[in-house]
Regions:
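C-terminal ends of transmembrane helices
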Residues: 41-47, 113-124, 161-171, 257-265, ...
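Structural signature of hydrophobic alpha-helical transmembrane segments
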Residues: 95-109, 146-155, 238-252, 294-306
């Protein structure tokens, strides 16, 4: 019996009157995740594309895989580097160590987030929404590898409930869910999100990795600059991603592969991506020319979460600007704000998280102004 036939055979048990009717939303969620919904328009003529929202989310997850895989390797690399054992560590050993450190966080993120979504759908008698497929993998990639699992679970619960569900679910949230989780952690547990003691895994797992001494410290390049020191990492290491940082944000090459996938499949707006980089470069040039920032413009781009945020966060179709002109303004605003926060607020050397959340808040206003401007222009032409 095929999986399709097996699901069809089970369907009557979940329909009204069936003994498992209370779990119909769970059945529908699994069915539509595995197969394209077989829907017929009740009025008018429509052509249904095979790409629905779940397939779009799946493509975004696929685009994140290069950054995730390199992040796993970098976890092991930073651990071996900190232990002074880089010469004897193997690439596969470092990758497996990183995978064993990261997978529990991904599992906790999905279990807590999807568990809340399932429970919420059951409570409201609605279909399970698919938006958390992307947020579930984004959240572990934008936090330090040393973050305790219970903190991650708490942040996921907060973000899903208070950023998404109470606003109506998928497609109705004002702020990016993954960034809301990170903001919750940043303001609630700053010691676990910033500083120089959180960027390298310090313990062995399943016989892999190295145990680091208590009190070991390792600063990110942006953290070094904030403390008045120069960046020790080479440009090559910055681009490859062999530097301390959150799991998925370090490798520009891996992020670029994800960007190509998103642009090629027309899932994310290249205008938003490009304008974020333009805004960041313009502000970086201004600050560097005035002596306010020691970093070159390209260092601002390749360090921290700038590239990751520009590709995967700023382009969120729900929370970003939707008008074509608005995308340029929205992206430029985020890029410029990220560099401004980095330079003018030494206590928070990253900047990208707050810049994107600020952009999310401004996106509806940007779209409104663009639409009103077009309406006013057409009204003037009509009077001529």
């Amino acid at each position: 019996m095929s999986l399709r036939n097996w699901l069809d055979k089970l369907r009557p048990q979940f329909e009204e009157g069936g003994k498992w009717h209370a779990f119909k939303s769970i059945y529908d969620g699994m069915d539509t995740f595995l197969y394209v919904p077989n829907e017929t328009s009740k009025s008018g003529t429509s052509i249904h594309d095979a790409i629905d929202s779940k397939r779009i989310m799946s493509i975004v997850v696929i685009s994140l895989i290069p950054a995730m895989l390199f992040g796993m390797y970098n976890i092991g690399y930073q651990n071996a580097l900190a232990a002074g054992k880089l010469g004897e560590a193997t690439c596969m050993g470092m990758f497996l160590y990183g995978a064993l450190m990261l997978l529990p966080k991904i599992l906790v993120s999905y279990i807590v987030g999807l568990g809340i979504e399932f429970a919420w759908a059951q409570w409201k008698g609605e279909e399970i929404q698919e938006g958390y497929l992307v947020s579930g993998i984004l959240i572990p990639l934008i936090v330090p590898i040393t973050l305790p699992l219970w903190m991650l679970a708490l942040a996921v619960a907060f973000a899903v409930i208070f950023t998404k569900e109470i606003f109506g679910g998928t497609g109705m949230n004002t702020f990016n869910v993954a960034l809301a989780a990170r903001a919750f952690l940043f303001f609630s547990y700053p010691g676990s999100m910033t500083g120089d003691k959180i960027w390298a895994a310090t313990n062995q797992i399943c016989g892999l990795g190295y145990t680091l001494p208590d009190g070991f410290t390792m600063a990110t390049p942006l953290g070094e600059v904030a403390q008045g020191a120069s960046v020790n990492a080479s440009v090559c290491d910055m681009v490859l991603g062999l530097i301390p940082g959150s799991v998925g944000e370090t490798s520009v090459i891996a992020i670029a592969i994800g960007a190509i996938i998103l642009i090629w499949t027309n899932i994310a707006s290249w205008k938003t991506m490009f304008s974020v980089f333009v805004g960041g470069i313009v502000m970086a040039l201004i600050f560097h020319s005035t002596g306010a920032s020691p970093l070159q413009w390209y260092e601002h781009i390749v360090l921290g979460g700038f590239c990751f945020g520009a590709i995967f966060m700023a382009t969120d179709p729900v929370t970003s600007a939707r008008t074509e002109q608005g995308k340029w303004i929205y992206g430029f605003l985020i890029g410029a704000m990220a560099v401004i926060i980095r330079v003018l607020n030494p206590g928070y050397p990253e900047g990208m998280m707050l810049a994107i959340l600020f952009g999310n808040m401004c996106a509806p206003l940007i779209d409104y102004c663009v639409v009103q401007s077009n309406i006013n222009k057409r009204a003037k032409r009509a009077k001529m």
